Amino acid sequence: MVMIQIELPDGSIKEFSETTTPGDIAAGIGSGLARQAVAARFNDRMVDLCTPITESGRLEIITLNSPQGLEVYRHTAAHLMAHAVKDLYGDRVQVTIGPAVENGFYYDFYCEDHAFSPDDFEKIEKRMQELVKANLPIEREEVSRDSAIALFRELGEHYKVELIEDLDAPTVSLYRQGDFVDLCRGPHLPSTGRIKAFKLTSVAGAYWRGSEKNAMLQRIYATAFPDKKELRTYLNKLEEARKRDHRRIGRELDLFSFSEEAGAGLVIWHPKGALLRTLLEDFERREHLRRGYDIVMGPQILRTDLWKTSGHFDNYRENMYFTDVDGQGYGIKPMNCLAHMLIYKARQRSYRDLPLRYFELGTVHRHEKSGVLHGLLRVRGFTQDDAHIICTPDQLDEEIKRVLEFVRDVMAIFGFEYEIEISTRPEKSIGSDADWERATGALMNALKDLELPHDVNEGDGAFYGPKIDIKLKDALDRRWQCATIQCDFTLPERFDLTYVGKDGEKHRPVMLHRVILGAIERFIGVLIEHYAGNFPLWLAPVQAVVINVTDNQADYAKSVSDALRAAGVRVQCDLRNEKLGFKIREAQVDKIPYMLVVGDTEMSDGTVAPRFRSGKNLEPMSPEDFARFVQEECDQYR
């Protein structure tokens, strides 16, 4: 008799004389593992716990406390929600897709005669609880493609039919729980009773298959956790995130707006927001000049032929906007790199000229689908702090280290911790093995030399080169992709960039794309939520407000305001005939760092009484001393 040999992650081997399942193997190892098991990976393929194992291979039990396990748990919760919605709304609703996503899951529904709202959530959650209590077995079924089409057509699930018709496979997998059936690859939990804690959180619109040409669906977002304590912790964090929502704070502080008249995803900056953005951009310019970058500028539109040369036309044109000028096609730039290539090519370069570091705060436009637009965090028009570093191969290691040090210093200024990932060569790529080895080695060496911890994403680099991604962590422990360092073998080749080496021969330079903050709009959105609108003094659009106690001090308050403004302080003067407490509270709501109260005593002494927005009072001081105080506080960022 041939034994089935199963190799476990620790290298141990278990033998079985007959067919077994991952669930049985987990139970044989220990009851604790069996309770935590949600799925398995057998020979690098994700499977259910009840999947029969009939051959030898490698097995890993996937538990609930792993990212993959939580994804399986939430994917099953998505099916549970769809089941509940179908039970409650019947044939009025068609189900479409429902994946697990970061921090939860969603399911998209088509329903002509009912608009889902938070008012429906309690009813849906109640039905979900009933299905959990019923502990329905969740069973996988392999059927022919034609049988699946016939089944879902009979059920009136036309979106499922469309999905299956687009598949080439002769068979598809279905998952059943009670009278609910869904098209799915799996894996899933063994039964509905394994789901312990969930909450529906919001509803939004989403186009079928992400195309505005298709029907508008209703997307219900939700989350699920292994226990109620974890769920409560997450919901508390979610509530705090709502309070910090940059769209709400941006409106309350009069920073920016969006208008359907202008177009979706296009930011309109109000005076305070434009000033905040200007302060941030000025900071970037100073830092780049200090670190040896040259500031450059490129046009907003470039000829279509140039986008064909770069490869963007073939690979990115669906995300671009095009126009015609005097019969000549032009593309509105979605990226800043092409003008930088032309600047380099404007004259012959020598090895003595390198490295060249071109920096541009360049505004770009990308045709993002309307369903993914989200305040400042996802827009169609935005400005990137793009730089392209063109250097010799021998200079690559040092240039990468310089960029990483730049990122480290900037993140410290804003108070962000961050995580680093390096992505290596994918299966489909361009460039020689030597190019990839040199570039990947340079990225790795820089991280090692600077003692920066990092994760490696094998095979996740771009086709044109390896990269480092830096994700900052905000006050709510959320991750945001901002800085990127990307090696590029494509553009130097496509634009025939060369330099004359010490040997008098022409050589191909190495190029790095890099951003530090990324999109300025997105970074400001992250800053607003990180600080909850309480910007540090150097970034605050209004640094202080002068508040008079009575009309007697109005002239003095105005003179103080004028003097501070002349000294470079961004100041307002509140002379309204309102009570002092009211004006102080309003300044706190506006998140102005300092309130300078002036009454008869201050007027007589020629001073102001500073009060921080937290309520802490400073000793009275002269307007000149306060201006110096602000100057010293902000000098480190100038």
Curated annotation (Swiss-Prot):
Could you give the subunit structure recorded for this chain? Homodimer.
User: Region (Catalytic): which ranges?
Assistant: 245-536
Q: Which residues form the TGS domain?
A: 1-63
Q: Which PROSITE patterns match?
A: AA_TRNA_LIGASE_II, TGS
Main localization, broad class = cytoplasm
Signal peptide (from-to):
none
Q: Which residues bind Zn(2+)?
A: C337, H388, H513
Could you list this entry's UniProt keywords, alphabetically sorted.
Aminoacyl-tRNA synthetase, ATP-binding, Cytoplasm, Ligase, Metal-binding, Nucleotide-binding, Protein biosynthesis, RNA-binding, tRNA-binding, Zinc
| Cellular localization per UniProt | Cytoplasm
GO MF assignments? ATP binding; metal ion binding; threonine-tRNA ligase activity; tRNA binding
Known Gene3D superfamilies for this protein?
A: 3.10.20.30, 3.30.54.20, Anticodon-binding domain, Bira Bifunctional Protein, Domain 2, Threonyl-trna Synthetase, Chain A, domain 2
Q: What's in the GO CC field? A: cytosol
- What protein name does the entry list? Threonine--tRNA ligase
* Catalytic reactions of this protein: tRNA(Thr) + L-threonine + ATP = L-threonyl-tRNA(Thr) + AMP + diphosphate + H(+)
Q: Which family does it belong to?
A: Belongs to the class-II aminoacyl-tRNA synthetase family.
GO:BP terms for this protein? threonyl-tRNA aminoacylation
One of this protein's Pfam families, by short name?
tRNA_SAD
Source lineage: Bacteria, Pseudomonadati, Thermodesulfobacteriota, Desulfuromonadia, Desulfuromonadales
